[in-house]
UniProtKB/Swiss-Prot annotation:
Protein name: Inactive serine protease 35
Signal peptide segment: 1-23
Glycosylation positions in this chain: 110
Span list, region Disordered: 192-246
Keyword Glycoprotein: yes
Sorted UniProt keywords: Disulfide bond, Glycoprotein, Secreted, Serine protease homolog, Signal
Entry's localization field: Secreted
Length: 412
């Protein structure tokens, strides 16, 4: 299975690079100047209730045609949407207002496909082309090791030793923070030790209890009980490994950042363009992570293909990888027919391109998978699995969240 999957990966990469209409320049990361986001003022807000229900599907999302008819957002509108809420581990919450400097408006992207009849709601299109990553050689190595699972049921991706990028709706429904996000945890993939791992040393209290029990009962009965317990635990671990289900190391989230473009409250519906959030981990990890990149246009995608991995709920905690071509785009969204189920939302969408002036290739995150949505295209409803593009402004915002200033956010 592992060899076949590796061969398929090589074939896919080669297939995306053989189109004679594409030049070598099209397969490079183009360094772009990033506008500055400056924190202007921070306000303390009331602590959230964490009572909202998770909302995975938004009805009648403003699609490409709809966005094309809207006036271009003003600088004030952008600054309002890019201002952000931060929720801390102790339940406190703040709102930070930002100023944008050096922003150059981008031209509106053209529609890349023609109108189509209304489609039946679905998240897997035709033959299911997803691949479960079962081989440990792939599962715990880059790029698959960058995928993480959220305790709220979504996926995410490691973008630094301390940060995870995910979809905003995984923690906030646009009006309030969802149930389960108060004590949010992130599960990182880890290797299973042979034989189920090392046995932890018991606490001093547990050792005292065992000592007391030993005085009341025979040492032989205690040994038999301990052996039986270890056999049961070892059997459960081996069964999970045989099923291809990964093991997780769970880490608490220290704070969460969400743009105001999503967390609009009761006054307006959340904007799908801002369905992304950054989670700061309480403890850093030592795994290889994936860097951010600015999303290129469809014409600059090798073969028009994107890739992402997540924990689809219909595959029992297996890590699922998929790749597909992008159908349409707007300035902020990518519309595609990648096969995916709930649980994979929040996954990092990435590309593998060549670095400028270097011979090596590098993967970078260019979008966040938002899930299955209905969008208005040419006056009809079309269903797409949608990803939120990382634009220069969003790159600057996420970088500001990570570093606290714009010192490392000038180019992307």
């Amino acid at each position: 299975m592992g060899a076949m999957f590796f061969g398929l990966m090589l074939f896919t990469l080669g297939w995306t690079l053989i189109d004679g209409s594409e030049s070598e320049q099209d397969f490079m990361w183009h360094v772009r100047k990033i506008p500055r986001l400056v924190s202007e003022r921070t306000f303390h807000l009331t602590s959230p209730a964490f009572e909202a229900d998770a909302k995975m599907v938004l009805n009648r999302v403003c699609g490409i045609e709809c966005q094309k008819d809207l006036p271009a957002p003003s600088l004030s509108d952008l600054e309002d949407s890019l201002s952000y809420e931060t929720v801390f581990e102790n339940g406190s919450r703040t709102l930070t207002r930002v100023k944008v400097q050096g922003w150059v408006p981008e031209p509106t992207q053209n529609l890349t496909s023609q109108g189509a009849p209304v489609r039946r709601k679905r998240q897997v299109y035709g033959t299911d082309s997803r691949f479960s990553i079962l081989d440990k050689k792939f599962l715990t190595n880059f790029p698959f090791n960058t995928a993480v699972k959220l305790s709220t049921g979504c996926s995410g991706i490691l973008i630094s030793p301390n940060h995870v990028l995910t979809a905003a709706h995984c923690v906030h429904d646009g009006n309030g923070y969802i149930k389960g996000s108060k004590k949010l945890r992130v599960g990182l993939l880890k290797m299973r030790n042979k034989g189920g791992g090392k046995r932890r040393r018991g606490s001093r209290r547990n050792r005292r209890e065992v000592s007391g029990a030993g005085r009341e009962g025979s040492q032989d009965s205690l040994k038999e009980t301990a052996k039986a317990g270890r056999r049961r635990k070892g059997s459960a671990r081996r069964q999970r490994a045989a099923d291809g289900r990964p093991s997780f190391q769970w880490t608490r989230v220290k704070n969460t950042h969400i743009p105001k473009g999503w967390a609009r409250g009761e006054s307006r519906d959340p904007a799908l363009d801002y369905d992304y959030a950054l989670l700061e981990l309480k403890r850093p990890h030592k795994k290889k992570y994936m860097e951010l990149g600015v999303s290129p246009t469809i014409k600059k995608l090798p073969g028009g293909m994107i890739h992402f991995s997540g924990f689809d709920q219909d595959r029992a905690d297996q890590l699922v990888y998929r790749f597909c071509s992008v159908s349409d785009e707007s300035n902020d969204l990518l519309y595609q027919y990648c096969d995916a189920e709930s649980g994979s939302t929040g996954s990092g969408v990435y590309l593998r391109l060549k670095e400028p002036d270097k011979k090596r290739w590098k993967r970078k995150i260019i979008a966040i998978y938002s899930g299955h949505q209905w969008v208005d295209v040419h006056g009809v409803q079309k269903d797409y699995n949608v990803a939120v593009r990382i634009t220069p402004l969003k790159y600057a915002q996420i970088c500001l969240w990570m570093h606290g200033d714009d010192a490392n956010c000038t180019q992307g």
